[in-house]
């Protein structure tokens, strides 16, 4: 199949955000921020550090897992699909931001360096902060706004209870209809009703829950097979 356009993958409602204001004074948040020489609101929410602070946080089961985005981006950006120029990946965060990622971006393999990079991005809006052509930049917009910006007709979802299908066929369906492919960027729970309501179709690649990074890797491999990249 001759692919004219790269496939677009959106990590949806990703568990990547700065510590929300209502948690700034919690001892666990203050302790971690002080240790790093930062203000509480300039640090990433991380359940491994802020578990007790997050107990009463809305949708706590979906939040505070920056490692999901880290591993997923490493998988995606190092893939043959991306190296051949046929992948565009976007990060939609739980608070409603969209992170635009240039295909040539090299994500730090070290998790602590990744955390620092994401904090810089969410504080300054782009990385590098003084660049006119940043590798990463963030905007506040809805998924519908993003789909319009990247000229997609809609979005399909990878969801546990979706129609069982092979990754290769899911990619083919998305490309033929000019749809983006949405994958949940959170550890537990389900998409919000807002996301579900705009999806054009829902698919599943396995009969049990899969991590985000396994799902994205399988979709990418499906695309690589479909377009004879590997």
From Swiss-Prot:
The record marks 67 as: Stabilizes Arg-65. The record marks 65, 106, 109, 113 as: Interaction with substrate rRNA. It comes from the Archaea. The keyword Oxidoreductase does not apply. InterPro entries: Alpha/beta_knot_MTases (IPR029028), Rbsml_bgen_MeTrfase_EMG1/NEP1 (IPR005304), Ribosome_NEP1_arc (IPR023503), tRNA_m1G_MTases_N (IPR029026). The keyword Transferase applies. Its EC number is 2.1.1.-. It is an enzyme of class 2 (transferase). One of its GO terms (molecular function) is rRNA (pseudouridine) methyltransferase activity. Keywords: Methyltransferase, Ribosome biogenesis, RNA-binding, rRNA processing, rRNA-binding, S-adenosyl-L-methionine, Transferase. It catalyses: a pseudouridine in rRNA + S-adenosyl-L-methionine = an N(1)-methylpseudouridine in rRNA + S-adenosyl-L-homocysteine + H(+). S-adenosyl-L-methionine binds at residues 184, 189, 205-210. It holds the Pfam family EMG1. NCBIfam families: PRK04171.2-1, PRK04171.2-2. HAMAP family: NEP1 (MF_00554). This is Ribosomal RNA small subunit methyltransferase Nep1. It comes from Staphylothermus marinus (strain ATCC 43588 / DSM 3639 / JCM 9404 / F1).
């Amino acid at each position: 199949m001759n692919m004219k356009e790269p496939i677009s993958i959106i990590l949806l409602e990703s568990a990547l955000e700065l510590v929300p204001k209502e948690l700034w004074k919690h001892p666990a948040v203050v302790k971690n921020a002080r240790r790093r020489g930062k203000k509480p609101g300039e640090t990433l929410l991380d359940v491994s550090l802020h578990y007790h602070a997050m107990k009463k946080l809305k949708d706590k089961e979906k939040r505070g897992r920056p490692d999901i985005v880290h591993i997923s981006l490493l998988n995606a950006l190092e893939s043959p699909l991306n190296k051949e120029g046929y992948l565009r990946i976007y990060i939609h965060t739980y608070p409603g931001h969209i992170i635009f990622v240039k295909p040539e971006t090299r994500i730090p393999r070290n998790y602590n360096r990744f955390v620092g990079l994401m904090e810089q991005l969410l504080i300054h809006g782009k990385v590098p902060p003084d660049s006119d052509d940043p590798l990463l930049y963030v905007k506040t917009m809805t998924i519908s706004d993003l789909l319009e910006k990247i000229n997609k007709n809609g979005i399909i979802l990878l969801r546990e209870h979706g129609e069982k299908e092979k990754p290769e066929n899911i990619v083919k369906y998305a490309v033929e209809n000019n749809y983006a492919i949405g994958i949940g960027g959170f550890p537990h729970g389900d998409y919000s009703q807002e996301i579900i309501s705009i999806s054009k179709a829902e698919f599943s690649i396995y009969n049990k829950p899969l991590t985000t990074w396994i799902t994205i890797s399988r979709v990418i491999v499906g695309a690589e097979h479909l377009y004879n990249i590997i």
